[in-house]
Amino acid sequence: MKIHTLFAAIFLLFIVTACYEDKGNYEYREMNDIEITVEMEDKHPSYALGDVVTCTPKLTFALGQESTNLDYEWSFAGKKISHTRNLEWVADTVANDKALQLAVLDKNTGVTYFGHIYITVSSKYAADGWVVLSEKDGNSTLAFIRHVSGFNTPSVAVRDVYQMINGHPMGTGPMSVYPHWTSSWGGEEEASWLWVAQKGGQGALDVSGSTYQQKATLSQIFLKQTYPEGFVPAAVMDLQILSLAIGEDGTIYTRVKETNKLFNTGRFIDRPLTSDAKGEVKVDGSMIAYTRFDYQAGLLCYDKNSAQYLHIGDYVDYDSGETRVGKALPLKVDEGDYKEGDAKLNDMRNHKVHFVGASSKGTDFTMSYMAVIENQTTGKFYLQKFTVEAYDGKMSAVPTKFESQEEMVGLGNVINGSAKNSFALCNYQEQAPYMFISKDNMLYLYYMSNSTLYPCAQFESNITSMNVNIYYNRCLMVGLENGDVVILKGIRSADGEPNLDRYVINGGNTIQVTDAENDFVLFHEKDFGRVVQVFYRWNMSWNEYFY
């Protein structure tokens, strides 16, 4: 009986639903969806507080015709900043690598569409740009020139920023300046700090890159809170865990930091770094191929005391936290790599190394290097090319591939023993196959593609320092003895821009850098004092990627 009743109920329910008439009024239409593209000239835009951030988004409509009833809302780091389609915003919020987002509301449908790009806004000084160390009126001075991309003119040039912030001169006898960082994960500060080496005053100083306040003095970080006897600081280079204090005579003293999350922990020992098992042969640190790469686990050094290239280890195991640092390791080269007459990397006797630099990021954490060497018997100059694997913390010699040695014809007229020479190697050799070499006030360009040396530019004073910026290697900064600082463009150019290939290499012309306007001069200012060192400071990351 219950079964019959159940069937009857189901049958009645079917009849009722079958007789129901849906009188709803539905309108079906195709959605005009919006695809939003938010792009800027640089892939990793970086701004300082007070900068004007502009962006013209690209809106693509699914039906090919733009909707008219739209609302716009821009936000950065979760803060609403504008309600216009095209953004023009004075940056007022400090944030690192946060989304600059555009939300577009179609009021006809109630649907909101989104597009974004990640940007960084930092303090006035915690930004990408050039650092200039110079000597003016007998004092060491630091200047900061903010310059994010290689196409635009630098937006801020702050002179003698150390004295302006700290209220007193930095010191005397400037020697060098190098940036250093803490870990990207929970480090003391995102911005890099600067080790400034100088002979007088307080000696070598550590300065915050975001405020330019003095943070430490090198002498106080030695075990005895004073320099070892005879030590005169020429450079301080901080790696992940290992720190190098390099003397004017090339002697290296080391410190092993307790963590890479803080800028200064641990103390320098008074025993010099050595390369032999007995600890008797001191490593000479006068020529180090300085790079900003933690994955290489150290730095390459040419040690003239042992006449060989060495890898100074700085290995950190990020899983276990284990460190293996502070050893000067030889390179392991297959003898079959060499041709007859090639100088061997672990036996450079009878050769003088004038320069060694990192040329590009290789594959599988290898690093490519180029060195300018001179055969002291024949007087001929050569370009050495070799690739070094990353140090894994266990190897006793670092595997290395010797690539080639080619004669640099004509370089003997540039490096003659009496002229002042500076060097700058473009990191991104695939697109900028150049090495810049100066002789007094003349700048030369060595073109890797045809192994030829070209006169490139003439200045009104001797060149004292050069450096190439990292953003696509677009610019070369040149510091002069008379206090001028010049940024040359044209290394890698946008369409229609001046180009070194066309003007110098193909045209046979030499750029004349004077006070007059010049298509190749992006920036030219005077009165910085005698320039000691210039370099491009990439603000917020250890790893300097070669774009």
What do these predicted ranges mean?
Residues 15-18:
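C-terminal motif of bacterial Sec signal peptides marking the signal peptidase cleavage site
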Residues 187-417, 423, 489, 499, ...:
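Preference for solvent-exposed, low-hydrophobicity sequence contexts
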Residues 20-164, 473, 481-547:
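Acidic/polar, low-complexity intrinsically disordered N-terminal segments immediately downstream
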